[in-house]
Structures are given as structure tokens and as C-alpha cells.
Amino acid sequence: MPWKIHKKRHLTSFQVIILGVILFGALILMLPISSAQAIITPFHKALFTSTSAVCVTGLAVVDTGSYWSAFGQTVIMFLIQIGGLGVITTATAVFILSGRKISILQRSTMQNAISAPKVGGIVRLMSFILKGTLLIELIGALFMMPVFCHDFGLRGIWMAIFHSVSAFCNAGFDLLGTKGHPFVSLTSYAVNPGINIVIMLLIIIGGIGFFTWEDIYLHKFRFKRYHMQSKIILTTTLCLILLPAVFFFFQDYGNLSGTHRLLASL
């Protein structure tokens, strides 16, 4: 029987960069300045948190709100933003802000990173993505600030910013846990429209993707002019939200009023 020849598989440049970002984030989170108790966080906990943030899974082995310091939470937020935008898009932001000229090779890399149909106009598209992301996250934070500032004082400003980024990137991280009540998430705001609706909209807008944004931006509400990908994404998203919401509305939350049941179901 002839021997099978297996080619060595090498990590791609994208994989190396992602692993580098995750590892760097983990090392920063290990530092005493990153934890609320000013202790060194075990490597496996820091690595898990960094991986979860970059890959925007929302899984956590420690409560984000009570375990990490403001510095640690900021690191997590930036890791979420990098993961949500993508490493190449984040790198592009640095190039654009620094005013550096972007080469053809770099433009081609950007095209592959976001699966753009062509290289032409890729910098303009990236700029649109970056500006749109920051604008939407800022608007989301501004809408949530009154509620969070009412409940947490000036700390509410930071909480609004963090939750806006987390929701837009579909990351699932929150800062509402305490030492006595960890991992409570947004349960205390389930029927608060000022938080509930804003978080929902941010999740949806961030989830539908950049190309769907462009279709909506260019063609407004003329659905027939959208690309097939955008049509499928929007239709599927609507069905996946409304159908389970109807089920939850009639199945659960029997002790809530109609309006509160609707908010909790959605």
C-alpha cells in the first residue's frame, strides 16, 4: 500500500494576525491593572476572555462587570471592536487616520478580507464602514446614556459606550454584574424601552453586515434594487426575530403586561 503524502499546512497571514491579537489581549488582561482586585489573572482565564472578545462569542469565565477594572473592560471593548470590524478593517482605519497612501497590494488584501466584488472603490467602502460603525455606536451610546446615568451616575457614560459597542458587534458582553449578583446581563432592563429597543436595533444593524448597509444607503427602501445577498439577509433576519418572538409572547411572561411582554419577547 503506497504511503500517502501529506502536505504541511501553514497558517495564513490572517490567522497569524488574529492569533497575535488574541495572545496580546490575553497578556494585557493578565496584568494586575486589568483586574478590579489588582491581581494577576491566570493565563487561561485571560486567554479565554480575549478569544471570546475577538471572536465575539459573548462567553465569559468571570463576570465582566465585577472582575475586570475599567482598564480591563476598555481592553475587552477594543478587542470586541477589532473582532467585530475585522483585523484588516481596523488596520485600514489606522492607515486612513494617519493619512498614509494605501498600495494596490493592500487594497487587494482589503478586498479579500471583506469579500468585496472588486478592488476599485475599496478604500471608499472601508471608509464608509468605519464612519458608519462609529456613528451608529455613538448614536446608540447617546440614547442609552440617560438611562444608565440615572442608575449609575457618571459611570453610566462608560456603560453606555461599552454596551453600544458590544451590542453592535453582537459580542454579548455586559457590565451589569456585581460581586453579589454576577452574570445578570440585561435582565433588569428587559422591559425598559430606553435600553431594550436600542440594544435590539444595534444587534440587528451590526448583524446584517456592511454590504446590506450599502444597499440600504444607496437604494433606501427600494427593496427590489437590493443585491440578492441583502434580500436574503434582511428576509431571514426578520423571520428569525419575529417568529420566535410570537412564540415567546404567547408561551411565556404571563405575569407581565402586554407592552412588557412584547419587549421581553423581542
Where does each model-flagged region fall?
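Membrane-proximal intracellular helices of multi-pass ion channels
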Residues: M1-L266
